[in-house]
Amino acid sequence: MATGTDQVVGLGLVALSLIIFTYYTAWVILLPFIDSQHVIHKYFLPRAYAIAIPLAAGHLLLLFVGIFITYVMLKNQNDTKKTQ
Amino acid sequence: MTKLAQWLWALALLGSTWAALTMGALGLELPSSCREVLWPLPAYLLVSAGCYALGTVGYRVATFHDCEDAARELQSQIQEARADLTRRGLRF
């Protein structure tokens, strides 16, 4: 069965994704229709960041995946050399 | 048509619609707030897909369960196979 930690981590991931989705939807979809003098604009970064942040996050993710794959492959190569 | 082709067609259709609307190729005069929503739309779709993926993984982590019946069935099948193989002269 899923233990307590699993449930906490899983529900935390669900909550995180819901928070990100709600905030991003409000930022990108709803904000242009709200008057630009409204107080709510204080709680959001300028609009260019709505693209820049996901782009940077995606690049970081790809970078880390690449580093991980390189590390694992190099390690495997060394291991097979040792056994031969 | 394969699933891949379907997805590619849908993406191409959506992408060309988006490009046409953003570049103003159709000659439509959209209100400025609509245009503000339109240009980050691909990023928005990507982020939504990412959120959905993260949520699915989280939900499955929170609710996964052991398949006890299947484990019992598998154990009994292993026993059966061992007995059968021992009868035919295989030693473990």
UniProtKB/Swiss-Prot annotation, chain A:
UniProt similarity note: Belongs to the DPM2 family.
Biological role: Regulates the biosynthesis of dolichol phosphate-mannose. Regulatory subunit of the dolichol-phosphate mannose (DPM) synthase complex; essential for the ER localization and stable expression of DPM1. Part of the glycosylphosphatidylinositol-N-acetylglucosaminyltransferase (GPI-GnT) complex that catalyzes the transfer of N-acetylglucosamine from UDP-N-acetylglucosamine to phosphatidylinositol and participates in the first step of GPI biosynthesis. May act by regulating the GPI-GNT complex.
GO molecular function terms noted in the UniProt entry: enzyme regulator activity
Record key words, sorted: Endoplasmic reticulum, Membrane, Transmembrane, Transmembrane helix
Pfam family, one: DPM2
GO cellular component: dolichol-phosphate-mannose synthase complex; glycosylphosphatidylinositol-N-acetylglucosaminyltransferase (GPI-GnT) complex
Protein name: Dolichol phosphate-mannose biosynthesis regulatory protein
Signal peptide range in chain numbering: none
Pathway assignment: Protein modification; protein glycosylation
Compartment(s) where it occurs, according to its Swiss-Prot or TrEMBL record: Endoplasmic reticulum membrane
PANTHER family listed in its UniProt record: DOLICHOL PHOSPHATE-MANNOSE BIOSYNTHESIS REGULATORY PROTEIN (PTHR15039:SF11)
Membrane topology value: Multi-pass membrane protein
Main location: endoplasmic reticulum
GO biological-process terms attached to the record: dolichol phosphate mannose biosynthetic process; GPI anchor biosynthetic process; protein glycosylation
Stretches that traverse the bilayer: 11-31, 49-69
Quaternary context: Component of the dolichol-phosphate mannose (DPM) synthase complex composed of DPM1, DPM2 and DPM3; in the complex interacts directly with DPM3. Component of the glycosylphosphatidylinositol-N-acetylglucosaminyltransferase (GPI-GnT) complex composed at least by PIGA, PIGC, PIGH, PIGP, PIGQ, PIGY and DPM2. Interacts with PIGA, PIGC and PIGQ.
Keyword match Phosphoprotein: no
From Swiss-Prot, chain B:
Compartments where found: Endoplasmic reticulum membrane
GO biological process terms held by the UniProt record: dolichol metabolic process; GPI anchor biosynthetic process; protein glycosylation; regulation of protein stability
Keywords noted in UniProt: Endoplasmic reticulum, Membrane, Transmembrane, Transmembrane helix
Regions crossing the membrane: 8-28, 37-57
Pathway membership, UniProt: Protein modification; protein glycosylation
Bilayer disposition of the protein: Multi-pass membrane protein
InterPro entries linked to this entry: DPM3
Entry annotated with the keyword Membrane: yes
Coiled-coil zones: none
MF-aspect GO terms: enzyme activator activity
Source organism superkingdom: Eukaryota
A GO CC term assigned to this protein in UniProt: endoplasmic reticulum membrane
Subunit structure: Component of the dolichol-phosphate mannose (DPM) synthase complex composed of DPM1, DPM2 and DPM3; within the complex, associates with DPM1 via its C-terminal domain and with DPM2 via its N-terminal portion. This interaction stabilizes DPM1 protein.
Primary role: Stabilizer subunit of the dolichol-phosphate mannose (DPM) synthase complex; tethers catalytic subunit DPM1 to the endoplasmic reticulum.
Family the UniProt entry places it in: Belongs to the DPM3 family.
Protein name: Dolichol-phosphate mannosyltransferase subunit 3
Annotated organism of origin: Bos taurus
Phylogenetic lineage: Eukaryota, Metazoa, Chordata, Craniata, Vertebrata
Encoding gene per record: DPM3
